[in-house]
Amino acid sequence: MRLSDFDFHLPDAAIALRPAEPRDSARLLVVRPGEGLEDRIVRDLPDFLRPGDALVFNDTRVIPARLMGRRAGRETGGGDGSPVAVEATLHRRIAPDRWVAFMRPGKRLKEGDRIAFGHDQDRACQAGMLDATVIAKHEGGEIELAFDFAGVDLDLAVAAHGEMPLPPYIAAKRAEDDRDRADYQTVYAREDGSVAAPTAGLHFTSDLLERLKAGGVSLHFVTLHVGAGTFLPVKTDVVADHKMHAEFGEVPAAVADALNAARAAGGRIVCVGTTSLRLLESATGEDRIIKPFADETAIFITPGYRFRAADVLMTNFHLPKSTLFMLVSAFAGQATMKAAYEHAIAAGYRFYSYGDGSLLFRAATDENGSEQS
């Protein structure tokens, strides 16, 4: 498959800069392969689920992982040794005092460079300044940082000085503000660690969750800490050559058991968001049994993949040539999703992290994962 197979024209105006209010008033495009499309709203979700279905959410919490700072001047002075402004988006924590991050301008950084973050009088940090040392530059553009703080002290410093890491397509149009601290967080978020929101979950309100439970749908929570790699574009023309960045996820034993029991009783597993789906697929064997999981995953789902866990997927509308558009094309079928996105664009659906949602029912596939006609 070529990257161009997943391209489509997306008008700039289609990208949402703010979420719908209230959250569950966002539009919802229901996609049943072979049965056409249906325009609804998110609060109609209970109409499409039945007693015994199991809804799976990602309960990760977004941290303010975007840090602004300056590289200190090197002793050599002048030229590339002069102080320079830098921006870091924390990606993955690897030790109490260490993160790997994506940084701009990363090419101007070297091992041993000192970075001074958080020297902002408007955001004073009681523990002191948030400084770090460049430890290593890794393959894929990641830069390893060792902070002067560790553990809880580092968490507090990042919370004091960091900004919410809005996706690039939104950040290019407006600055992050106080509203984003609430808007870019699900109502059920509880496990700190993500640098991007599991955006399908942003549509849920406490009232909608209660209505789902009242309808006999069980709610389950897993954790996948979304890394900054989710924002990176695919740069290879051959899709199979693309390498995903690893992210840490956990499926508790009790959740795995409950989901297996729900499926055995005839219920469907409904994933809220591609993060929940990717984690469950990583935790599920060829026998379609979901197992407890606590590890990194770099699963890359493209057309031809044979799904083991998910029966239904609720997800937002994704960007052209993105790994997530590849995933939904694998789930509901390439032709189906191209038609669905053409409809969504023509009908004025709002795209991307703060945009509207879609409810996708899995396409029938043969034993090789190929879509059946």
Swiss-Prot record:
The GO molecular function terms of this record are: S-adenosylmethionine:tRNA ribosyltransferase-isomerase activity
GO BP annotations, alphabetical order: queuosine biosynthetic process; tRNA wobble guanine modification
Catalytic activity, reaction form? 7-aminomethyl-7-carbaguanosine(34) in tRNA + S-adenosyl-L-methionine = epoxyqueuosine(34) in tRNA + adenine + L-methionine + 2 H(+)
Q: In the UniProt record, does the keyword Signal occur?
A: no
- The answer on whether this UniProt entry bears the keyword S-adenosyl-L-methionine reads yes
Which GO cellular component terms are attached? cytoplasm
**Major place of residence:** cytoplasm
Where found in the cell?
A: Cytoplasm
- Pathway(s) of this molecule: tRNA modification; tRNA-queuosine biosynthesis
Q: Keyword set for this entry?
A: Cytoplasm, Queuosine biosynthesis, S-adenosyl-L-methionine, Transferase
Give the intrachain disulfide bonds.
none
Any idea of its EC number?
A: 2.4.99.17
The superkingdom of the source organism is Bacteria
Q: Which InterPro entries match?
A: QueA (IPR003699), QueA_dom1 (IPR042118), QueA_dom2 (IPR042119), QueA_sf (IPR036100)
The UniProt entry, under Pfam families, shows: Queuosine_synth
Q: Which HAMAP family match?
A: QueA
Q: What does this protein do?
A: Transfers and isomerizes the ribose moiety from AdoMet to the 7-aminomethyl group of 7-deazaguanine (preQ1-tRNA) to give epoxyqueuosine (oQ-tRNA).
**Quaternary context:** Monomer.
Family membership, please give it.
Answer: Belongs to the QueA family.
Please name the PANTHER family in this protein's record. Answer: S-ADENOSYLMETHIONINE:TRNA RIBOSYLTRANSFERASE-ISOMERASE (PTHR30307:SF0)
Q: What is this protein called?
A: S-adenosylmethionine:tRNA ribosyltransferase-isomerase
Q: Which organism is it from?
A: Caulobacter sp. (strain K31)
